Amino acid sequence: MSQLDSNWSFVDDSKVTPKGFLFAGISAGLKASNKKDLALILAPEGSVFSGMFTQSIVRATCVDICQERIKKTSGFVRAILINSGQANACTGNLGIQHFQIATGKIAELLGIKEEEVLMCSTGVIGVPIQINDLVKNLPNLVSDLKGNNFENAAEAILTTDLTLKKVSIETIIQGRKIKIAGFAKGSGMIYPNMATMLAFLTCDAGIQKEEWDKMIAIAVQKSFNAISVDGETSTNDSFVGINAGEKIEKRFFPIIQQGIDIVCQNLAKNIARDGEGANCLLEVLVQGAKNTDDAIMLAKSICNSALVKTAIHGCDPNWGRIISAAGNSGVKFNLNDVDLYIGNAQILENGKLNKYDPQKVTDYIKSRMKGRYLVDDIVKIMLNLNSGESKGTAWGCDLSKKYVEINSEYTT
């Protein structure tokens, strides 16, 4: 266990997951590699679901039906089925039928209502789910449900990802252990405002739907909506947060919000760092903004700039690209007030070029390109607008030739 701050600590998710939640992850033959490709989360009775989904107008079947079911049940859902390999997007009525067949069978096996089952899919767009393989393996999936199968479920949702993306934390409130655990997938087609990513969060502190929705929205805005790999948005983006358990007093909500933020930001940074072909994480902090929305918007603009990303990959301290991306963000600021840092080197002071050693900045970026994963492989950029008290952070990665290779060979 490692300490995060005064409230939350990381825990081993193979031993500690939110009370009452069960997880499963198996191979159903949906991927040619025979890797795990089918996951299931079963929540306790009375659980509360909140979901946020892709903002693309081209949406997968699962996105629309999941939103409908969350609304119809007022968030009282019990299970999430997740498949990887086929996105079930742009598949017409067949996609709807496959969704209904799969969720109907899971509901039957679990003894719950079909409307209490959600389904999320990820994979190749336009390819229908291999429904026969999926359905025949659902009994095995249900049999695999265990509290400590969290990692299997996390593994089963991956596609081009190179690493597992999972985190579990706990704290004690009034003598009671509270746990929050989440896992995600995402490596390419990642752009601020939810993009080709799936993420799931579970929490064993009971919170009513209205408050839970607010907490999830706040966390997503500061995490999954603040990352960029390549500026592409997907058809299947989904984030679902679930809570269940004994009700928590409202005065402790800020602690729960802090925990949700920690999990979501941890997963978001993992997604950004695992960008296809990436060698480092790019972290942009904007300070001195008039409000948080402006700060995040400006930070995202820098993270999403292909010119900034390629400069970082080339270890080129091309600060002009950074300030240009800031200027294109839509956020109003006075250049004459701006301070800019790359690492510890101050590049601009009050909008004017400061004396700095470009080679030291190049060496700083090079060292981060060779650093340990999410430890010292983070290139930090800080922009201070000096016009307010608010701040915001966004994350991205370098853009490499490897990204082009991966996506020129991957069937879309």
Which functions belong to the PLM regions below?
Residues 103:
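Generic structural marker for isolated residues within well-ordered, non-membrane alpha-helices
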